[in-house]
Amino acid sequence: MLCVIAKLDKRSTEKLTAIQRAAAPDADGKPLHGHITLAAYMGEDEAGFMAFCAALLKDVSRFAVNYTHLAVLEETSIVAALAEKTGTLAALHRRIAEVYGSSLNEWTGSDEVWLPHTTLLYEPKADLPAVCRKMAADFAPFTAGIVGIEFSRVTPPGYEI
């Protein structure tokens, strides 16, 4: 699976990491890679998809997103910081989904199901509502900077940026 991700600035990644570590210091041992997934492509023509995205993104510079709250996404066993589905972020996702929606995964294939977020913890066996409440004690809504758009590849057991 080939993903298009919006990369967070260092300050925002550090802020989310601090929230994560305060509530789950042992987490899964991996550093937080601050990003929001715009699209997860599962089709056959990766070169065409990448060329389309590169053309779409060529004039996109830094932009802001607003993180509003934390939530448990039970279907995927994660605690996430949720961002507003507005502005440049939403426009980019919408355009990719319009053209490639049928080749995107179930979570990014349409505007109706896409939920822009940054995963803070993936732990299927944890009491995620309790962890989320603990993280929420250190969370306040904030504006984050998006400093670039990148491709990443999901490969067992992880991903490559």
Can you annotate each of these PLM segments?
Residues 1-64, 83-143, 160-161:
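Basic, often amphipathic N-terminal segments
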Residues 64, 74-80:
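Structural motif corresponding to the early beta-alpha repeats
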Residues 70, 75, 146-160:
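Glycine-rich beta-strand-turn "strand-cap" elements at beta-sheet edges
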